[in-house]
Amino acid sequence: MSEIQLNTIEEAIEDFREGKFLIVVDDEDRENEGDFIIAAEKVTPEKINFMLKNGRGVLCAPITEERCQELELDMQVANNTSLLGTPFTITVDKLGGKCTTGVSMYDRAETILALADPKTKPSDLGRPGHINPLRARSRGVLRRAGHTEAAVDLARLAGLYPAGALIEIINEDGTMARLPQLIEVAKKFDIKIICIKDLIAYRLRTESIVENGVEVDLPTEYGHFRLIPFRQKSNGLEHIALIKGKFEKDEPILVRVHSSCATGDIFGSMRCECGEQLHEAMRRIDQEGKGVIVYLNQEGRGIGLMEKMKAYKLQEDGLDTVDANLHLGHQADERDYGVGAQILRHIGVTKMRLMSNNPVKRVGLEAYGLEVVENVPIEVKPNPYNEFYMKTKKERMGHVLHNIK
C-alpha cells in the first residue's frame, strides 16, 4: 500500500465536508477491501443510486453507539460471531412522508437522512427495513480499525453529524476490488482514496487520548525500572508504562503489552499464564538492559473483573474461555490496543520486538502505525489447571503455543 500514492487525510476531510464520496481502503491484514463512503447528511437519491450501481456491495449506515440507543436499535444478534464482528443493528426504513416500500433510491436516501436527523424518533422508523445501520465503537478507529468507525470519524472531523453511508466495492466479475482495482475506480470517478491506517495515524498525531503522571523509580527483583502512570481521557482508566534503559529513536525495543490480570499477576493463579508471562517479560528486559512493559488496565481481556469471575464460573460448569465470554454477551476479546499504541508513542517507541504469542495483538498494534520488526514468543509451560484454557486460545483464538498439542 505504501508504494501507491494515496490522498492525505486533510484532503479527504475537505471533500467529505463538501458531500463528496471517498474510497476508504482497509488494511492488508484485515478485509483488504475498499468502500465508497459519504456523510449521511449529504446523501441524495442520485448518490445512493451511484453507490449501488458502482459499489455493488451491502448499503449500510454507520452511526454512533449513542444514536443507536436514542433510536432503540438493537443488534441483529446477541452474540456476534462474524469474522470481524461487523456491528449490524436491526434493519430500518423511514416511515411516512413520500416513503413507500423503503427500497427505492428515494426511500433509502430518506432513511439514511433520518438516521442523521436529531429530530428522528424511534417511532419514525419501521423495523425490519432496507437500510443496515452499523453501530460504530466509541473512539472510532482508535478503538476498532474498521470502515464503520472510519465513516463516523470522518464525519466528526469534517464538522458534520457523526453518521455516514457506505458500500463495499465489488468488481464487475463479482470478486472483491483490491487496491489496484480501487485505484482505477478512484481515477475513473475522480474520487479521493485513503486508507484506515492513515486515518488512525492522523488521529494519533492530532489527538491525545492519554495523559501521563509523574515518573518514579521502581526497584524490583528484576532491577530498576522507571514507572510512568497514564490516565485514559475517555474513561478515566489508569495504565502503567515500565521502562528500563535508554533507547534511540527508531530503535527496535523489546516490548511487552500486558493486560492486567489480578488473579494471575497478583495472586499467582494457575488458571492462566498471565503472571508467569509478566515476570518472564521483566526478566528478559532486565537481561537485555532495556525495554518497555505497557501494563493495560483491561482485566479479563477487557470485560472487567466482575464479568471475568462470571466467565470463570461458566468455565467451571464446562464452557471454554471463548464461549463463556460469548454467553455473557461479550466478544471473545474486547481489549483496546489503541491506548497501548499511544502510550508507546508517548514514550518514544515506534519500532519494537514484541513479546507475544497472540497474532491479533501484533496486527492491532501495527494498525495504529507502530512497526513490529520481530515477534518474540513468550511461552510458558502449561499446568493441569490452565492446559485446557491455553488449548482453547491456540485452537479458537489463534495463539501460537508450541507446548500445547
Swiss-Prot record:
The active site is at residues 333, 335. GO terms for molecular function: 3,4-dihydroxy-2-butanone-4-phosphate synthase activity; GTP binding; GTP cyclohydrolase II activity; magnesium ion binding; manganese ion binding; zinc ion binding. GTP binds at residues 256-260, 277, 299-301, 321, 356, 361. Keywords: GTP-binding, Hydrolase, Lyase, Magnesium, Manganese, Metal-binding, Multifunctional enzyme, Nucleotide-binding, Riboflavin biosynthesis, Zinc. Its cofactor is Mg(2+); Mn(2+); Zn(2+). Pfam families: DHBP_synthase (PF00926), GTP_cyclohydro2 (PF00925). Zn(2+) binds at residues 261, 272, 274. InterPro entries: DHBP_synth_RibB-like_a/b_dom, DHBP_synthase_RibB, GTP_cyclohydro_II, RibA, RibA-like_sf, Riboflavin_synth_RibBA. Residues 206-405 are annotated as: GTP cyclohydrolase II. Mg(2+) 2 binds at residues 31, 147. Binds 2 divalent metal cations per subunit. Magnesium or manganese. GO terms for cellular component: cytosol. Pathway: Cofactor biosynthesis; riboflavin biosynthesis; 2-hydroxy-3-oxobutyl phosphate from D-ribulose 5-phosphate: step 1/1; Cofactor biosynthesis; riboflavin biosynthesis; 5-amino-6-(D-ribitylamino)uracil from GTP: step 1/4. This is Riboflavin biosynthesis protein RibBA. Mg(2+) 1 binds at residue 31. CDD domains: GTP_cyclohydro2. One of its GO terms (biological process) is riboflavin biosynthetic process.
